[in-house]
Amino acid sequence: MKNLFLFCRSGYEKDCAAEIQQRATELNVGGFVKTNINDAYVIYQCFDDNGADTLVKELALSSLVFARQMFAAGELLSDLPEQDRVGPIVASLAALSKCGELRVETPDTNEAKELSAFCRKLTVPLRQGLKKSGALLNAESDRRPIIHVCFIGPGKAYAGYSLSHNSSPHFMGIPRLRMAADAPSRSSLKLDEAFGAFLTKEEQETRCRSGLNAVDLGACPGGWTYQLVRRGMMVAAVDNGPMDPKLMETGQVKHYRADGFRFEPPRKNVYWLVCDMVEKPARVAELMEAWAINGWFKEAIFNLKLPMKSRYKEVSVILETIGAILTENEIDFKMQCKHLYHDRDEVTVHLWIFPEKGVSYA
């Protein structure tokens, strides 16, 4: 297949396009971008007929900042007949065999969501047709490729596949999280999503466990602290503003009325550092670098507020700078960055510092 379909947030098509153009070029997969503002998706059309197949194998979705999900797709199926939508879609996927799941989706826009009821209605007969053709297994399997059919308008769809090990587990790449009634603010969902995006369930059990120490810089009123407390951690909440009284009643939070940029942890066994401050991204990045160089945390999740223009370029420069500075200081690390569903004009970074042997964070 020659088209790579990428889901993104509406309004961030240019950033997603700039990123895939650069990353595909690095993999020697030539092509060009097709996108429109506020469509919430990007098409990277490869010059090679098998270019998209190469990208879904070799380009890790987790390494892309602005793409929520991606799949290799054939040509746009336009003017699908009302009396038979299934036939042309099944025919376009004739090259696929024994896939494990079907997802009939739309981009994340209000206009496209109007097709959601139609997509749900189409899913059953389409699944039957794909099973009959052999493209889809009779029983779902999370180890086989996923068939995607994305309707971008009435009678218009891209159809293709993603690989289960290089794909978002979520429909349209969007996790469905519930806002807890006792959470101090909606920002709580950002950290909840971040833990799920950067750590597997098994990793969360060992690295987000009860008893770990955490620091929340810019904590007020406690949206991110809430997620740490919910996981059983002891939290140093740093902010000159007031914290949510219910959080303070848990006995797991100590409130430091201080400037997050000047705070130094009194204890040096901090495992998690989290930070969601409305500040220039370069300044936040410098703060994270300083904490890493001082050895004040093991893992960090922090947000970088984005400029109005050249957002991909800005993020790339900051991430490269963080990487260069940590490398210069001989710090071994792993870093990921994502524009999460619950992020707005910001991206979320996960930085994991590999500890020296024998260091305890309990």
UniProtKB/Swiss-Prot annotation:
The source organism is Shewanella frigidimarina (strain NCIMB 400)
Its biological purpose is as follows: Catalyzes the 2'-O-methylation at nucleotide C2498 in 23S rRNA.
**Enzyme Commission number(s) of this protein:** 2.1.1.186
What would be one Gene Ontology cellular-component term for the protein? cytoplasm
Transport listed as a keyword: no
Primary site of residence: cytoplasm
Return the broad EC class: transferase
Q: Which GO terms describe its biological process?
A: methylation; rRNA processing
Q: Subunit structure, per the record?
A: Monomer.
Q: Which reaction equation describes what this protein catalyses?
A: cytidine(2498) in 23S rRNA + S-adenosyl-L-methionine = 2'-O-methylcytidine(2498) in 23S rRNA + S-adenosyl-L-homocysteine + H(+)
Record bears the keyword Methyltransferase? yes
**Identification of the protein by name:** Ribosomal RNA large subunit methyltransferase M
Family in the record: Belongs to the class I-like SAM-binding methyltransferase superfamily. RNA methyltransferase RlmE family. RlmM subfamily.
- What residues does S-adenosyl-L-methionine bind to? 187, 220-223, 239, 259, 276
Its keywords, alphabetically, are:
Cytoplasm, Methyltransferase, rRNA processing, S-adenosyl-L-methionine, Transferase
Q: Where in the cell is it found?
A: Cytoplasm
GO molecular function, one example?
A: S-adenosylmethionine-dependent methyltransferase activity
Q: Where is the active site?
A: 305 (proton acceptor)
Instruction: List the InterPro entries hit by this protein, alphabetically.
Output: RlmM_FDX, RlmM_THUMP-like, RNA_MeTrfase_FtsJ_dom, rRNA_MeTrfase_M, SAM-dependent_MTases_sf
Q: Which Pfam families match?
A: FtsJ, RlmM_FDX, RLMM_N
